[in-house]
Design a protein with these regions (language model features):
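Short, charged, amphipathic alpha-helices and their helix-cap/turn boundaries
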Residues: 38-39, 71, 79, 118, ...
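Catalytic loop of the DD-peptidase/beta-lactamase superfamily, centered on the K-T-G motif
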Residues: 29-55, 59-61, 212, 255-520
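Second-shell loop/turn segments in exported
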Residues: 29-32, 86-88, 124-128, 153-159, ...
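Hydrophobic secretory-pathway targeting helix
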Residues: 2-31
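Short, conserved catalytic-motif segment at the N-terminal edge
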Residues: 32-89, 125, 173
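Active-site helix/loop module of the DD-peptidase/beta-lactamase fold
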Residues: 54, 88-92, 104-151, 174, ...
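Carbohydrate-binding/catalytic loop surfaces
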Residues: 231-255, 261-262, 318-320, 324
């Protein structure tokens, strides 16, 4: 969906080598009041700069929740945001699903290196031979070969039936893999939805029941939910989207379907997610309760594929070296940071933890803007910096086109509109031209040809460069980024639609003019 998750996080690390009022507070004496004021000031400043209605954060140190805080509002009525307010956490569902799978590994119910077909005998993709080679580990490491864009189409399903998850996985029998299992990395929800079905099949419970009983309950995640209805009952925040640059409540496109629950459909609060991070930082322990062994936690955190010497993907976690924190580690060593982000229309979320520094942060925001995601995610990493006594990062930005996509599209569409008016006027004059105006006719022919070239270049650039690079389609843009999608449609209407009509009219009028000249 939109900018791809890993590219957003990686961009941060490349650069690294209403008046909002705090509305809830909880902290222990591990932090000074001055440090907490700095955190509050930073978050409020970012909210103002990025026009974010509401934010909730949490900071963990060792086995303690150091600080939780809510800022701004949770809805248009001005309800105060708190650290207990539920959010749609989108892809933060993935590390939760990965934890569930690892619990089943510990119980001996599943083998990471076994093929999916061992547990789902009917499981198929288009290539039957390849079907038997996709393992559980491939799914966890996002190396199965499934296509990212196709998974976003599945996100739009509204099927909430008991059979929905299994039926969606059975429908993969026509899926073409982008590469052989284990050969490369491609982030896709499909992998984790299959894992969710495995949890459901091997546990004998629904995915939702398992997550609630085996993860939410032991971690005291009382404001975490596996259904939209439950989250709304817990007073979840509304989501906001910058519709043509105006922040607007826009959360109707929710994950109603059970199909995407394991990959992107869970709900939680900042307070609850600090409990989840404590278990990650403390070898699977939370308040004396072990939800997973130290060995299995280590497996979850170990990269299965490397993007570079300093970056890789583990099981539900991206793993990076964090050089900016070397000054606060023993022996000035460069610590490893683990992170995952979540995006949906109206919601942005981020988890970060640094095991060597025993520090973790939760960042939940009730706004999503595909043009500002690097800036959003850098807030989370800056909070991690502040939490260990360092200065926040310099503000991050998307690439020029990404950051200014709405303005650029609007300018192009206006220019195309002006060009359309000009072309209509010229075409109306063309039939009256006589032989003495042949030079003007030739000039107009050149102008029309140049317009056609510009139209073709814009259409090709959008359809074959911009959209494929962002793993997007016009249809998905209209659903997940409606204003940008609408401008894409207008651009294509002007270039391919009107451009074709204009060219045909010019050719017809030229023929009429030639006949008129011949008659004279």
């Amino acid at each position: 969906m939109l900018y791809r998750y890993f590219l957003k996080v990686a961009s941060i690390f490349t650069i690294m080598g209403l008046i909002f009022v705090p509305t809830s507070r909880q902290f222990v004496a591990a932090e000074s009041y001055k440090e907490l004021q700095e955190i509050d000031s930073y978050v409020l400043g970012q909210m103002k700069d990025l026009d974010i209605p509401g934010v909730a954060i949490g900071i963990v140190r060792g086995d303690q929740v150091v600080y939780t805080q809510g800022y701004g509002v949770a809805d248009d009525a001005g309800r105060a945001m708190t650290s207990d307010t539920p959010f749609l956490i989108a892809s933060l569902s993935k590390p939760i699903t990965a934890l569930g799978i690892m619990q089943l590994v510990e119980e001996g119910k599943i083998n990471l290196d076994a093929p999916v077909q061992m547990y789902l005998p009917w499981f198929r993709v288009a290539d039957e031979e390849v079907s038997s080679k996709i393992t559980i580990r491939h799914l966890l490491h996002q190396t199965s070969g499934f296509d990212e864009r196709e998974s976003y189409v599945r996100n739009l399903s509204t099927d909430s039936s008991v059979e929905a998850l299994e039926m969606s996985i059975r429908a993969l029998n026509t899926a073409e893999l982008n590469f052989a299992p284990g050969e490369a990395f491609e982030y896709t929800n499909t992998n984790y939805d299959i894992l969710g079905l495995l949890i459901q099949t091997l546990s004998g419970q629904s995915y939702e029941q398992y997550i609630e009983e085996k993860i939410f309950d032991p971690l005291d995640m009382d404001q975490s939910y596996t259904s939209l209805e439950g989250a709304r009952g817990g007073n979840m925040t509304r989501g906001y989207y910058p519709f043509f640059g105006i922040t607007t409540a826009y959360d109707h496109l929710m994950p109603y379907s059970r199909i995407v629950k394991p990959s992107a459909g869970l709900f939680s609060s900042a307070e609850d997610l600090t409990h989840f991070l404590i278990a990650q930082l403390n070898q699977g322990q939370y308040q004396g309760n072990a939800i997973l062994s130290e060995e299995r936690i280590a497996t979850l955190h170990t990269p299965g594929i490397q993007f570079s010497e300093n970056a890789g993907y583990a099981m539900g976690w991206s793993v990076f070296s964090f050089p900016d924190m070397a000054s606060v580690t023993p022996n000035n060593s460069i610590p490893i940071g683990l992170t995952h982000a979540g995006e949906w229309v109206g919601y942005t979320s981020l988890l970060v933890f640094i095991p060597e520094l025993e520090t973790g942060i939760v960042l939940l925001m009730n706004k999503h803007d595909p043009a500002r995601m690097p800036e959003y995610f850098s807030i989370g990493w800056s909070l991690a910096m502040l939490a260990v006594g360092l200065e926040p990062l310099e503000p991050q930005s998307a690439d020029f086109i990404g950051k200014n996509i709405r303005v650029l599209l609007a300018v192009v569409i206006v220019l195309l509109g002006i060009g359309a008016v000009w072309a209509v006027r010229k075409l109306r004059q063309l039939p009256s031209k006589s032989g003495s105006d042949s030079r003007q006719n030739q000039k107009l022919a050149i102008q029309m040809t140049l317009l056609a070239i510009v139209d073709l270049a814009l259409a090709v650039g959008l359809l074959f460069i911009r959209l494929p690079e962002s793993k997007d389609t016009i249809f998905l843009s209209l659903r997940f980024n409606p204003d940008i999608g609408l401008m894409y449609v207008l651009l294509l209407m002007f270039t391919l639609g009107w451009g074709t009509i204009r060219t045909l009219l010019f050719l017809r009028q030229s023929l009429k003019t030639n006949k008129l000249e011949n008659a004279i």
